[in-house]
Amino acid sequence: MPLRWQIDHAARFVHIVGEGPVTIEQLEEHFDAIAVANAMGYAKLFDASLVQPRYTDDDVMRMGARLSAYTANLPSGPLAVVGQSEEVLITFRRFVNISPSDRPARIFRTEAEARAWLKSQSGHL
């Protein structure tokens, strides 16, 4: 599975790991699962170090509409993404730019940096 996630309700934390090609449909599935679990407001760590994004500009716009629907009714917790490839950096910027949420979001080179920042943002981890 290209995307897998674990939700820790006690810690109010979602850990997402991606590997290989990831499509917009797989991202939608992950967002839906997190929303259904009432975890949208939790701190999120997305390790995209091994992700190969596979979506078009139209896909990104479609995801923007979906994120608008989520954030209209659900809180958004801080997001830390781990990744170093140019592809992941570009994709992160595109999603942050289209997201209607004003949540804090940053990209990091290491998981340790991401976790430290999330802890400073949410007090959890």
Across the structure, where does each feature detected by a protein language model lie?
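Amphipathic, Lys/Arg-enriched alpha-helical "gate/interface" segment within cytosolic domains
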Residues: M1-L125
